[in-house]
From Swiss-Prot:
The keyword Mitochondrion applies. PANTHER family: MITOCHONDRIAL INNER MEMBRANE PROTEASE SUBUNIT 2. This is Mitochondrial inner membrane protease subunit 2. The gene is immp2l. Disulfide bonds: none annotated.
Length: 170
């Protein structure tokens, strides 16, 4: 009987030592989940500021390959605070010319290897209008689905507000 118990313990330990590296690699390279805090992406994410925070599925694989399109919602390392990750919408890609918000008649050409990101809730978002174009190297992942709360479960499709379309696309 004791030998039978040891076999289960040994199987559990060996399974544990296989499962942990596989899980860590998956979360580091493929996908993970994150809770969205704040109001900067309202109404797309966290539409009710007093309610539950949205929990989103983040696809890390696409970000690693710099597979970015206008309208994608992405998670990125904050250019102002490397300890913080922020979530924003891609408005423009390299070579695009964008009219900035909050600056009269100011136009910016997005440099090579960069994107222009903004929150959906203008005036309540710390985004490219404050810190400029963002290096593709700061992208962490793409938000692909809202997982929680259950009544908000949905796929996040790329969407670009008409008023935020680029002035010129290369």
């Amino acid at each position: 009987m004791a030998q039978h118990g040891r076999r289960y313990v040994r199987a559990f330990i060996s399974g544990f030592f296989v499962a942990v590296p596989v899980t860590v690699t998956f979360l580091d390279r493929v996908a993970c989940i994150a809770r969205v805090e704040g109001v900067s992406m309202q109404p797309s994410l966290n539409p009710d500021a007093r309610g539950e925070s949205d929990i989103v599925l983040l696809n890390r694989w696409r970000a690693r390959n710099y597979d970015v399109q206008r309208g994608d919602i992405v998670s990125l390392v904050s250019p102002k605070n490397p300890e913080q990750k922020i979530i924003k919408r891609v408005i423009a890609l390299e070579g695009d010319i964008v009219k900035t918000l909050g600056h009269k008649n100011r136009y910016v050409k997005v440099p090579r290897g960069h994107v222009w990101v903004e929150g959906d809730h203008h005036g309540h978002s710390f985004d490219s209008n404050a810190f400029g174009p963002v290096s593709l190297g700061l992208l962490h992942s793409h938000a692909t689905h809202i997982l929680w709360p259950p009544n908000r479960w949905q796929k996040l499709k790329p969407f670009l507000p008409v008023e935020r379309e680029s002035v010129q696309n290369d």
